[in-house]
Amino acid sequence: MSYNKNNIFAKILRKEIPCKKIFENDHVLSFHDINPQKKVHALVIPKGDYLNLDDFNNRASDKEIVALSKAITEVSKILGISFDTGKGYRALTNLDEHGGQEVPHLHFHLFGGEKVGKMVE
């Protein structure tokens, strides 16, 4: 899999496709998933052209890496699913074919608002 600048997340970042934005800063955008799998289902993506987590960790600046990590926590707070609520959430990213990655742009799913269930079936 290689990075495709016409993937849906790249189009959202270029504002060619609308999204229901939750959070944004210089390095990260978060928005609601259009096909939620749980009561709360958000996506958190870096603004750079990163294919997956390995690509991101190898090429992103320290500032981008910290921004993405902190954004996940900030989004969980905005959505009311953060650790301090006592409920929690699952943060998930898929990597390549065997990992189930469908969109060739690094993205984290945040699932919550209800019990998430088993990790892998």
Regions found by a protein language model. Give the residues of each.
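HIT superfamily nucleotide-processing domains
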Residues: 1-121
